[in-house]
């Protein structure tokens, strides 16, 4: 997922407007670097340079080093996106339109960033190896949290299909981001959004029809001439 799903920033209080702590600056720098370069470009030196934090503060705030910082940054991004998804899905528009809007918003965000950034969770997932395997369940848990938000919004669709559709939405948007970034063309996201929206509309229609015509219920007998 991308910044398009993040919630709109609220006006900051005086306390919130104070300079961010070195820990917060490192977390935000890590998020930005992970979105741009994955794990390979989000090393300790890169985070320190991007955040402007004192070098000695890294292990003070994150004794586990790069992996601990990456974990915190991923979870922060995951929560941010989940909040944004929930806000977008809570609107009054039909569900297929809202889901298509998520894809289209992500497409606009990627184009605005000149395809230099995508989803930090997706980028890290593609970089995982034996040394960073501890991040695999972190990424999987974040994907699952986004899927849960989507599934909860699919009112009227039975749970097994609802869950499968939610997983498919995440898979589609992640794959479309990879293709869009490679081709520097956001049409992959726009096209995927239209197809996913059509599938959700079909699922809603079929679920509604199934409720109106439960299995085993005889269809009303059509009248014939002479009856």
What are these regions (language model features)?
Residues 109-112, 126, 130, 170-188, ...:
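Amphipathic C-terminal alpha-helical segment
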Residues 15, 22-29, 66, 165:
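N-terminal positioning helix adjacent to the helix-turn-helix/winged-helix DNA-binding module
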Residues 1-21, 206-227:
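N-terminal intrinsically disordered/low-complexity leader segments
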Residues 85-117, 166-169:
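Hydrophobic alpha-helical connector segments
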């Amino acid at each position: 997922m991308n910044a398009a799903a993040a919630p709109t920033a609220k006006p900051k209080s005086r306390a919130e407007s104070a300079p961010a702590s070195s820990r917060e600056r490192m977390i935000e720098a890590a998020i930005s670097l992970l979105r741009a370069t994955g794990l390979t470009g989000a090393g300790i030196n890169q985070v320190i340079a991007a955040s402007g934090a004192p070098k000695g503060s890294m292990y003070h705030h994150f004794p586990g080093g790069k992996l601990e910082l990456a974990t915190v940054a991923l979870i922060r991004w995951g929560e941010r996106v989940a909040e944004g998804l929930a806000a977008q899905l809570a609107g009054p528009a039909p569900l297929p339109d809202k889901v298509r809007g998520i894809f289209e918003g992500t497409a606009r965000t990627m184009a605005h960033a000149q395809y230099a950034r995508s989803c930090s969770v997706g980028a890290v997932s593609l970089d995982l190896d034996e040394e960073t395997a501890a991040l695999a369940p972190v990424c999987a848990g974040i994907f699952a949290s986004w899927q849960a938000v989507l599934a909860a919004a699919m009112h009227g669709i039975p749970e097994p299909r609802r869950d499968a559709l939610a997983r498919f939405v995440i898979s589609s948007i992640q794959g479309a981001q990879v293709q869009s970034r490679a081709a520097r063309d956001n049409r992959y996201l726009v096209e995927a959004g239209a197809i996913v929206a059509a599938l959700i509309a079909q699922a809603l229609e079929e679920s509604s029809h199934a409720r109106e015509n439960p299995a085993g219920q005889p269809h009303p007998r059509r009248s014939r001439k002479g009856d």
